[in-house]
Amino acid sequence: SGIAREEIFIETKLWPAFYEEDDQIDKTLERLGTGYIDLLLLHQPSGNYMYAYKLMEKAVKDGKVKAIGLSNFNETQIQEILDNCEIKPTVLQTEAHPYYPQTEMKKFLAKNDIKIQAWYPLGHGDSNLINEPIFTKLAEKYGKSNVQIILRWHIQENNIVIPGARLEEHIKANIDIFNFELTEDEMKQIAAINKNKRYYEGTPEKVASYAQMKPDLDGQK
């Protein structure tokens, strides 16, 4: 592509069914065709995740991974990691959006110097969320789309935000959010639409099942 590797940020995850496979990180590097991963996460608090976390710590020491983190872990599980780790997780990837802003979780993460990465940042594309009157009003005021207003809210909430996009025009629109700023009152108005609504329900049974599911990773090359 002509772009230096240092200019590209590669983030990926370890799947629970492979948590106890010592060579899985090396296999991941091979599949990605890279010498190192910028951010590696544990996908779910399933299976032997403490063992997998130790493997990630070793990968950091060996220069194969720059930073490590967690995905879909709750406070108790994160604390278990913190109590037993040598290298602290830098990021928690978890569902976060205006209907589920993760207020309490963010307080816990802030105390432990862990950043939140918002998964489902647009509420899984829920039109009810995206078309909330407050977003339509602010979109008209700032000359932006409702989606751009939501993404700007994430930025001002200090969330790392990862909206999915395949079309070039959508990618450009997603990053065209740094030439305006929501006021404190507008942020409060958005906070008022919190419904404590999740789109992903990680029941104990569902999470446990992930450790038994082995996707064909080689087939995904």
Describe the predicted segments one by one.
Residues 4-5, 88:
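Conserved H-loop
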Residues 5-19, 38-45, 72:
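A short, structured active-site edge motif that brings together acidic residues
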Residues 3-4, 65:
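Conserved hydrophobic residue
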Residues 1-2, 85:
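Active-site catalytic pocket residues across diverse enzymes, especially alpha/beta-hydrolases
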Residues 16, 44-221:
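Beta/alpha (TIM)-barrel catalytic core signal, keyed to glycine-rich beta->alpha loops juxtaposed to Asp/Glu
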Residues 21-42, 58-62:
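CE4/NodB-like, metal-dependent polysaccharide N-deacetylase domain
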